[in-house]
A protein has these predicted regions:
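Short, Lys/Arg-enriched N-terminal segments with co-localized hydrophobic residues
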Residues: 1-8
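Vicinal oxygen chelate
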Residues: 21-24, 70-71, 81-127
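Conserved beta-strand in the GNAT
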Residues: 73-78, 132
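Short active-site oxyanion
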Residues: 13-15, 90-91
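Short beta->alpha transition motifs characteristic of CBS
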Residues: 133-137
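Short, glycine-anchored, charge-dense loop/turn motifs used at functional sites
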Residues: 29, 127-130
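Core segments of cupin and vicinal oxygen chelate
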Residues: 7, 18-71, 102, 108, ...
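Residues that flank catalytic or metal-binding motifs in active/ligand-binding sites
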Residues: 11, 59-61, 88
């Protein structure tokens, strides 16, 4: 059970991914995670992009993926100039009723399977960020 909100302690807000191609990586994670979608581009957002010299949302340097319900963290995908070069120091653990079937679905979406261990599967997203798929607890 979660502790009540404390104005003194920090809370997890957003998870931010550095990305070479924020829009395509955002689409991968929106499809990968239950209850998440790429935030829509309304007129105000399109105007913000144009004001920053971005004509096409596909070239947006910072793409938001939102949960369908309040509570879970939002995901931001931010353009960075350098490629990923080493293993993640932090990774996400996804939970699924059937980790092998879920890993196969994620591979069809563009992930790469890195390892199959006892009870879980390690994958990398299309830009090489490692994550695990484990059984539901």
């Amino acid at each position: 059970m979660a502790a009540p909100y404390s104005p003194v302690m920090a809370r997890l807000g957003d998870i931010v991914f550095d990305a070479a191609h924020p829009a395509s990586l955002a689409r991968f994670w929106a499809a990968a995670l239950d209850g998440y979608a790429v935030a829509p581009y309304d007129e105000a957002e399109l105007a913000r992009l144009r004001a920053n010299g971005v004509a096409d949302p596909e070239d947006d340097p910072s793409v938001l993926v939102e949960p369908a319900v309040p509570g879970p963290p939002r995901l931001f995908f931010t353009l960075v100039p350098e490629p990923k070069t080493v293993k993640n120091r932090v990774h996400l653990d996804l939970r699924a009723a059937d980790p092998d079937a879920e890993a196969a679905r994620l591979v069809r979406l563009g992930a790469t399977q890195l390892a199959r261990l006892d009870g879980w599967v390690t994958l990398a997203d299309p830009e090489g960020n490692e994550f695990d798929v484990l059984p539901v607890q």
